[in-house]
Amino acid sequence: MSKKITDVVNIATSAAEIERYPTPEDRLVKGNPEQNNTLHFSTDDRFFVGEWGAEVGCWKVSYTENEYFHVLSGKSILRDTEGNELIVVAGDKICVPAGFEGEWEVIEPTQKIYAIYEN
């Protein structure tokens, strides 16, 4: 079936609602950061586009999905299980492969736009 212009999503003007939630206790490393997510687009349970943000803190991550993200603001550290770090700041464009495990540490409140493909 052919899609129409009404199926196109402009993220800047999307009416999607912001979901705010605490970081799950079993993943916390330090702090108690609130996270937020706005899902702008998903046609199935495999591909998602949205905006995400978090306050200062650190938690464990385990990616089952491939993710591309563009940092809009803030500063965070993505750390693998061996302690290797990648500092991400506004303007960075990052791809994280499914299977990545480690920690996400927010140094300054961070906001990103993302596209996720769940394997």
Question: Which sequence ranges carry the predicted segments?
Answer:
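Short, conserved beta-strand element in jelly-roll/cupin
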Residues: Y63-L78
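Ligand-binding loop in jelly-roll beta-barrel domains
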Residues: A98-N119
